[in-house]
């Protein structure tokens, strides 16, 4: 698409917004940026990248978008914003950065693998990227995982080197403003309550996820998730994965845990560096996606052995006095914490809490009753989690800080136990982000170890 001399307003000055502004300016667009409350750091970075670019600061209204032909909206900005909705009603075009990428690469020969879901998508995206590289493909991993897609696209255009495959992690927010993406293989890994502060209900949220299947590519679907099972689209090839039954990609539980492909045991899970049964599901999905674009199984299995996993995703921090300390700070919703607990084989002292984003915490109860010794609660929604678990028979304690909770968990844990930070909540009520929350946990674990030495 030709952006030369088009009046484009980039809405939201986060990482994807900054990348969009740079990309569009490089293609000759007349760029304006609008943000209700931009940080000084982002404004300074924008000025360094695009000196003199017009910036509209403050609540959006009709004047904010006056004269614009196209709005490029960042994922954190709801399309239901009254000024954006009015722009659309008046015939204005509103897209996101994924849509700009989709239009740019259409027909260029690159493969696209698209990954969404409530939980596990960052792990699966990273794993798929690793497996594609292991199979010899020039691979770009981008999207919701951290690298803005338009930053990656601009770099590739400037180098003149088209990748073999784009591996994209996509949030529901990104998919809302995406229309042309035609992935060669795509998955919705699972659906659990998340972002209900932005969606009417769980079905509304799930519907946004289904946009990943626009086009005619291979659908890789979770047979164990009822909402995902309902996403089959006529005319699409489908590959199923399951931990609990027969599927194209399944788990054998006799004689240890083995990954099965088309009924044949092909990989001993003991050879993976990832912990927990939920990561077996992630591996099955990744194999389905990679085989969906025609990659050979043998090279994929070799790649599985060398994937180390992601920071802050069920990551072992340390082990001393027979107690393992595991960081799952990226577990920001109930489904993620459920998965972490269900993947544990040792008794757990759980640290949870933060900003619950309107979730129902009831599903935590059976998972905690199965494996937890105690639950320590922090943050804004500690009381709501406590109410959901109050008749569970578990020891429940509230703590004012994560440092206090970590020290208390270490005191309650017995040799052979796991202290698990898996908050089931966002972090912004107490921390800069989930990585900051993780670092506080890691530092406190180190202090506990030093005090016991």
Curated annotation (Swiss-Prot):
| Residues reported in the UniProt entry to bind ATP | 117-123
> Which EC number applies?
6.3.2.9
Listed A to Z, the keywords are: ATP-binding, Cell cycle, Cell division, Cell shape, Cell wall biogenesis/degradation, Cytoplasm, Ligase, Nucleotide-binding, Peptidoglycan synthesis
| Cell compartments where the protein resides | Cytoplasm
Molecular function per GO = ATP binding; UDP-N-acetylmuramoylalanine-D-glutamate ligase activity
Query: Which domain of life does the protein's organism represent?
Result: Bacteria
Please classify the protein's predominant subcellular localization into one broad category. cytoplasm
Single Gene Ontology BP term? Answer: peptidoglycan biosynthetic process
- The EC class name is ligase
Q: Which reaction does it catalyse?
A: UDP-N-acetyl-alpha-D-muramoyl-L-alanine + D-glutamate + ATP = UDP-N-acetyl-alpha-D-muramoyl-L-alanyl-D-glutamate + ADP + phosphate + H(+)
Where, if anywhere, are coiled coils annotated? none
Which pathway is it part of? Cell wall biogenesis; peptidoglycan biosynthesis
**What's in the GO CC field?**
cytoplasm
Its biological purpose: Cell wall formation. Catalyzes the addition of glutamate to the nucleotide precursor UDP-N-acetylmuramoyl-L-alanine (UMA).
Alphabetical list of HAMAP family matching this protein: MurD
The UniProt entry's sequence similarity note says:
Belongs to the MurCDEF family.
What PANTHER family does the record tag this protein with?
Answer: UDP-N-ACETYLMURAMOYLALANINE--D-GLUTAMATE LIGASE (PTHR43692:SF1)
Q: What is this protein called?
A: UDP-N-acetylmuramoylalanine--D-glutamate ligase
